Amino acid sequence: MGHRLEVTTPSDREIAMTRVFDAPRDLVFDCWTIPALLKRWMTGPDGWSFAVCNIDLRVDGQYRFVWRHEDGRDMGMTGTYREIVRPERIVSVELFDMDWTDGEARSTLVLTEKDGRTISVNTVLYSSREARNGAIAIGMAKGVEAGYDRLDGVLAEQVAAS
């Protein structure tokens, strides 16, 4: 527990988010792909809840996520899985309902296990430098870090139960 999120910009259109988790990558992969687990940690910033979490985990399968603010506003996103290599890699394209990223973004999640810990690298490729900079400006990293802190708790429960 207590690992920090490292955010880098490998290119003018990418954001890479790296984090270590004290759990085997099978469990981390499950927390990204099983709706009941994903809903426990990817809840969004304070004041938001994860209202819809539908996953068709197969190549060309879709996912649909909707976060709901306590004031009733919704923020939705639809994505399509392009590559799934359990438990090490997921590639998808995603598009928010209110398209603030100027088109689809490509997300590549790579999970590497070492000594019982998982190194997670999630790289998002945006359509333009401006879209990437917009994601940085709205504080995406802060929200991701809060979610990953919640994921630590979910993983600790899963490890204890196994």
Could you say what each language-model-derived stretch is?
Residues A16, A36-D74, S162:
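Short beta-edge strand/loop motif at the mouth of beta-sheet-based domains
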Residues V28, L38, Y63-F65, Y81, ...:
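Hydrophobic pocket/interface hotspot
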